[in-house]
Amino acid sequence: MYTDSFSDGGKFNNLDAALKHTEEMIKDGAKIIDVGGESTRPGYTLISDEEEIGRVVPVIEAIKKNFDIAVSLDTYKTKVAEAGVKAGCDMINDVWGFKYGERDMADLVAKTGVAACVMHNKNVITYNDFVNDVVNELKESVEIAHKAGVKDSQIVLDPGVGFAKDYEQNLLIIKHVDKILELGYPVLLGTSRKSVIGLTLDVDKNDRMAGTVATTVMGLERGCRIFRVHDVKENYQAMMMAEKILKA
């Protein structure tokens, strides 16, 4: 529901288009619909809490009214998250992992009982031992959640592909995402159409489906079971095929 998304900004920023797109994604296999009112791409434009609420709440309400589907709200702002929960969202996707955004977000999650996708992110790209540092920094986010009263059953972790990582680091964290799974929480992998795919294949954002599917299958093989994608049908079918092979 914003116009400056790196991939599909502006395509679904009215209610009718959002509902039609939701219907299509559910038909294609989606189990969670992610709603966002402010882009988190590099160089994104900040908007006020009130504007963000005005963008996301009507969409959440309409989706919950018209479809039997879980809704995730992509926001790091507590006031927006609170409005989203009241509107019916089931999960908060905090791109700052309770650490660098608004620190009372974990309190809200604990109080309301919604799920929380806790993403790895940081202000400066500095690491001593990259993969272990990401794992340990996600542990810190989990500790913040626990101190606020968030239960383990509410927590999903996200390695944060494309956030506070260079090209090689993005490849490494996809390769070693199983290390994050060792923390004992479900892991969401979000690679869809991201620059690591564009740089690898030398393709623009509109031609990254094949690369996205490859990362989805790789993540599935390593144990991920939640994937944030734009092209639902293609990724869902690839997952189903890969899962059959893995279980054969």
How would you name each of these model-derived features?
Residues 5-21, 40-58, 62, 67, ...:
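Active-site-adjacent loop and "lid" segments of alpha/beta metabolic enzymes
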Residues 20-36:
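Catalytic domains of carbohydrate-active enzymes, especially glycoside hydrolases
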Residues 29, 34, 88, 149, ...:
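Conserved functional loop/turn residues at catalytic and ligand-binding sites
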Residues 26-31, 141-154:
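Phosphate/pyrophosphate-binding loops at sites that engage ATP/ADP/AMP, CoA/4′-phosphopantetheine
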